[in-house]
Amino acid sequence: MGRAHEVRAASMAKTAAKKSAANGRASKEIYMAAKAGGSDPSSNLALRALIDKAKSNQIPKEVIDRAIKRATGGDAENYVSNRYEGMGPGNTAIIVDALTSNVNRAAANIREVFNKNHGNPEGKVAFMFEEVSMFAFKGKTEEEVLEQLMMSEVDVNDVEVEEDMIIVTAPYKSFNAVKHSLDELGIEEYLMSEIKLIPIDDYIEVSDAELKQQLQTLLDKLDELEDVQNVYHNATI
């Protein structure tokens, strides 16, 4: 299976609860990056990447600006990142990344969602995923992108063309180098520009209608939690 579904999943229409959660997680990420490296995206590459990611996820400009203003205004709020693993309906593997000011609250809420929605928060599944840099955009040919990346001598795993999109996958450590090379090529708008987890093996096809609905509900409930930043899984639903 290609990577176009990764981009589609990230850009799907969200419920009001999901939109609120998405705004909150973008705000926290941008706040932490600006607080650590300064408010200028031209010199703070981590902040620039998160702003690009927020824009591709249709986060309102005022949310981005407010997070940066908080970081530069002496706000002392701090967040801790944690990763949680579990199993979902259909023997699917799920990883949840949280960024929270209250670790106990985050852990309890994530565990509760698993337990109440046919999941198991005790599963160990991290070994089933790998961390990669992923970029998706339109407006360039595969040949143009390959030539640019080769000229830049950056480490890339794959370049695919799917549904009029160019999708570039690279080692997570190559994110800044690949992003810089693509920017030089003239890419101004990214459908995806982030470091994420993807399954090492093929995605699991969940064909049973009841299991599929149970899994979708579990993923939706996790995604709506205030402290959850990302939810990764190895299922096609």
From Swiss-Prot:
Gene Ontology, cellular component aspect: cytosol
Keyword Transcription regulation: yes
Compartments where found: Cytoplasm
GO biological processes: regulation of DNA-templated transcription
Comp. bias (Low complexity): 9-20
GO terms for MF: DNA binding
Domain of life: Bacteria
Principal location: cytoplasm
The entry's keywords: Cytoplasm, DNA-binding, Transcription, Transcription regulation
Signal peptide range: none
Stated family: Belongs to the TACO1 family.
PANTHER family assigned: TRANSLATIONAL ACTIVATOR OF CYTOCHROME C OXIDASE 1
NCBIfam families the UniProt entry points to: PRK12378.1
Protein name: Probable transcriptional regulatory protein Mfl546
Organism lineage string: Bacteria, Bacillati, Mycoplasmatota, Mollicutes, Entomoplasmatales
